[in-house]
Amino acid sequence: MTAQQHLSRRRMLGMAAFGAAALAGGTTIAAPRAAAAAKSAADNGGYVPAVVIGTGYGAAVSALRLGEAGVQTLMLEMGQLWNQPGPDGNIFCGMLNPDKRSSWFKNRTEAPLGSFLWLDVVNRNIDPYAGVLDRVNYDQMSVYVGRGVGGGSLVNGGMAVEPKRSYFEEILPRVDSSEMYDRYFPRANSMLRVNHIDTKWFEDTEWYKFARVSREQAGKAGLGTVFVPNVYDFGYMQREAAGEVPKSALATEVIYGNNHGKQSLDKTYLAAALGTGKVTIQTLHQVKTIRQTKDGGYALTVEQKDTDGKLLATKEISCRYLFLGAGSLGSTELLVRARDTGTLPNLNSEVGAGWGPNGNIMTARANHMWNPTGAHQSSIPALGIDAWDNSDSSVFAEIAPMPAGLETWVSLYLAITKNPQRGTFVYDAATDRAKLNWTRDQNAPAVNAAKALFDRINKANGTIYRYDLFGTQLKAFADDFCYHPLGGCVLGKATDDYGRVAGYKNLYVTDGSLIPGSVGVNPFVTITALAERNVERIIKQDVTAS
């Protein structure tokens, strides 16, 4: 049997495990042949050789490769497994009529586009629930993160972009870029099932009129665009358009989850991890504290809650190998808390530092009445404006959809800029949380870069900005939230060059907190590839060698 056949078989076994978990209605997910000890530790507390905190990109890579190496591994996920339909027959709700499934314990949705014509017509009152999208609000920056098995892969737009090699070498100079671009990026893209849109279909379909309009307008300003690969199955999307399958991307689904079409991590890495028979996932379990045990291992205090937020149990789970894959916010907070409360006192001062929003700035332009963008829009982006030249004004701008179900004449963009400003997480004893030290002024370089680009497009086309989409005030640039949190445990500073946390043995960071605040494109492919690189070395040198 070939390696690819082994992987396909593991995926099938893993998908069966997810299906069985849905039928059982429990929080423990494992293949039938998974070790009883791991299941017991998941249910009751106890010891398991390896624990991975989180189920996002870096966590999923680590769990799969540990499972393949024969290491019994427990993944702890604070969100739920999203595979049980709600009253409407769908697992996820759409963007236009969100309900409690949309949001992580909110009384009201907090969509990135919060208004239209300055009217509060976008967000809805909802019941607090363990929903799929969280907006974590700090003093002057908010961050969108996914909650559930699969993490951010459940709620992102799926744009699978590799960074410019020159910029990758600038931000991570101690990582061998040849290895990354020759081995680990291809491995990540293959596992993530990255695919490309049929360009002929793109040119003909009504669903991407919005992107073609933005491309034409960028061209008038002398700017080029590039097609962007995705983990959403473009072949499935074409069948959606033909009326052959249920719609998802063509039914305004994305930020609150896709019911069809998207190859999120539960269908790729995590399914393969479960299929090894060595990996167990425990949902609705949040790690609160980490301490080192006398034998050099780690003990975790873990809270189990239900989907209404009720505390059901507090457990202690111990392990020899601990991988933090809870994302830039989650992993950083756990380590900042551990350092500053004294449970891991040897963590260095770099823990919490080097955080950035990947230069994220959202903006929109008002088109002329004779230049409509289309009432029918795919929710999955397919084009980007590539104005990244490694200068301080570099921009890669995702041409974003605005699938409102009616004509808006709006061109929407998520600009990724080269903002050098960085924030720092510090421990707040009063709330027992990590507080982000970041000011709106620190986003001025990002706003200036985005403004320079879109001023150029507006001038070439005789258009203006939309000022009514980001709240009740006049505002053309949304600089107070981001989709791409990066940093907090930067590679080579808080850790060694492979994610080993400085000051401790067998403690690793494996997610976006390793990347120093910026990567110049949508970051999940880089996070995945970097995790592949790091865990390969860790398993060889730290796990199998011992």
From Swiss-Prot:
Protein's UniProt keywords contain Secreted: yes
Effect of H484Q: Mutant activity is 120-fold lower than wild type for oxidation, and the same as wild type for isomerization
Catalysed reactions listed for this entry: cholesterol + O2 = cholest-5-en-3-one + H2O2; cholest-5-en-3-one = cholest-4-en-3-one
Pfam families per the UniProt record, alphabetical: GMC_oxred_C, GMC_oxred_C_1st, GMC_oxred_N
Cofactors (names): FAD
Residues binding FAD, per UniProt: Y57, G58, E77, G152, N156, G157, M159, V287, G512, F524
GO molecular function, one term: cholesterol oxidase activity
Keyword Transmembrane among UniProt keywords: no
PTM notes: Predicted to be exported by the Tat system. The position of the signal peptide cleavage has been experimentally proven.
Annotated effect of mutating E398Q: Mutant does not catalyze isomerization (>10000-fold reduced), and oxidation activity is 30-fold lower than wild type
Localization (cell): Secreted
Pathway annotation from the record: Steroid metabolism; cholesterol degradation
Signal peptide as annotated in the record: 1-42
Enzyme Commission number: 1.1.3.6, 5.3.3.1
Record's keyword terms, sorted: Cholesterol metabolism, FAD, Flavoprotein, Isomerase, Lipid metabolism, Oxidoreductase, Secreted, Signal, Steroid metabolism, Sterol metabolism
Gene3D superfamilies in UniProt: Cholesterol Oxidase, domain 2, FAD/NAD(P)-binding domain
GO cellular component, as recorded: extracellular region
Active site: E398, H484
Swiss-Prot/TrEMBL GO biological process terms: cholesterol catabolic process
Stated family: Belongs to the GMC oxidoreductase family.
Function comment: Bifunctional enzyme that catalyzes the oxidation and isomerization of cholesterol to cholestenone (cholest-4-en-3-one), an initial step in the cholesterol degradation process. The cholesterol degradation pathway allows the bacterium to utilize cholesterol as its sole source of carbon and energy.
Subunit and interaction comment: Monomer.
Listed name of the protein: Cholesterol oxidase
Organism in which the protein naturally occurs: Streptomyces sp. (strain SA-COO)
Gene: choA
